[in-house]
């Protein structure tokens, strides 16, 4: 009985630590990061930091979350400076993609407004203190530091002067990314809920039907591990899918931009490891203890 209580205490401790790590991962925004410092240094060293290129960096395209009323968007020129209150829409860039390429705005990676970012499940933010250009835009109120990640699909946009196949591909990519994001968030939420139930059941096992409740808690912990695995794999798939979206001159990243997973995702993986360990401990111990009891009974009967 003492060993069973010790196993329950260890598994409960592991599950609580796992729950804390999982909640930390869910509510922090450092799942994925991009670092454009080397990219900017490379562009500067190649002499691409001329006034035109600098102007392009100070006139962010649709990727930047702008403040203000979207009704003012259409009255602004696509390549005009973005004033406080101006909002750029994705279709503005896409409708004029040929002219943009002709003007050379997107032909060169150094002409693109790329800034260091970090993102989580709920929002994407720019890293302050690295690039003075984005710092200036945020301080002036032209751009927001963080923007919410979409979990709903807006009405299909009508794109002019753009091939139908490209328009359809962009919309299909939006659908696929939306589903992947929903799967990631949904399964992670279910994992947190099931893990909380498992912790409660494990705590109850100290006072009532220790063998049964311990086994049920172990099954709940293993179910949490399955949900976490699905969620984390889906998140990795969504990141890879987004990096390979078409057209590359809008959605892709230059080779010299460093990008990768960050500490929030590490917390989620650590949570997965702890909860699987707790689940295996809770589910395996009753069978091991039962085998030992049967072996002792058999040895005693043999002696008699």
From Swiss-Prot:
InterPro entries: PMP22/EMP/MP20/Claudin, T178A/B. Residues 208-215, 289-304 are cytoplasmic. It is a multi-pass membrane protein. Glycans are attached at residue 165. Residues 26-186, 237-267 are extracellular. Residues 1-25 form the signal peptide. Pfam families: Claudin_2. It comes from the Eukaryota. It is found in: Endoplasmic reticulum membrane. One of its GO terms (biological process) is negative regulation of osteoclast differentiation. Coiled coil: none annotated. Keywords: Endoplasmic reticulum, Glycoprotein, Membrane, Signal, Transmembrane, Transmembrane helix. Disulfide bonds: none annotated. The chain crosses the membrane at residues 187-207, 216-236, 268-288. GO terms for cellular component: endoplasmic reticulum membrane. May act as a negative regulator of osteoclast differentiation. Belongs to the TMEM178 family. This is Transmembrane protein 178A. It comes from Xenopus laevis (African clawed frog).
């Amino acid at each position: 009985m003492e060993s069973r209580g010790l196993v329950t205490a260890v598994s409960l401790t592991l599950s609580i630590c796992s729950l804390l790590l999982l909640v930390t991962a869910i509510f922090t925004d450092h799942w994925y990061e991009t670092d454009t410092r080397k990219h900017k240094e490379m562009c500067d060293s190649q002499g691409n930091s001329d006034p035109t290129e600098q102007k392009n960096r100070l006139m962010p395209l649709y990727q930047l979350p702008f403040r203000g009323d979207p009704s003012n968007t259409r009255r602004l020129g696509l390549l005009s400076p973005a004033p406080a209150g101006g909002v750029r829409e994705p279709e503005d860039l896409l409708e004029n993609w040929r002219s943009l390429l002709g003007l050379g705005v997107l032909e060169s990676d150094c002409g693109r407004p790329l800034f260091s970012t970090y993102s989580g499940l709920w929002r994407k933010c720019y890293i302050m203190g690295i690039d003075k250009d984005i710092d200036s835009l945020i301080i002036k109120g032209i751009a927001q530091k963080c923007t919410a990640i979409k979990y709903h699909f807006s009405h299909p946009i009508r794109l002019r002067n753009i091939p139908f196949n490209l328009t359809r591909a962009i919309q299909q990519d939006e659908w696929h990314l939306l589903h992947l994001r929903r799967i990631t968030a949904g399964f992670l939420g279910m994992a947190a809920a099931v893990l909380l139930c498992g912790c409660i059941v494990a705590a109850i096992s100290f006072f009532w039907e220790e063998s049964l409740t311990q086994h049920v808690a172990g099954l709940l912990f293993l179910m949490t591990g399955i949900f976490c695995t699905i969620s984390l794999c889906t998140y990795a798939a969504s990141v890879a899918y987004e990096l390979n979206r078409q057209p590359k001159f809008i959605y892709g990243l230059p080779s010299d931009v460093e990008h990768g997973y960050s500490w929030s995702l590490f917390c989620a993986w650590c949570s997965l490891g702890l909860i699987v360990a707790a689940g295996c401990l809770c589910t395996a111990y009753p069978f091991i203890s039962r085998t030992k009891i049967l072996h002792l009974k058999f040895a005693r009967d043999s002696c008699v």
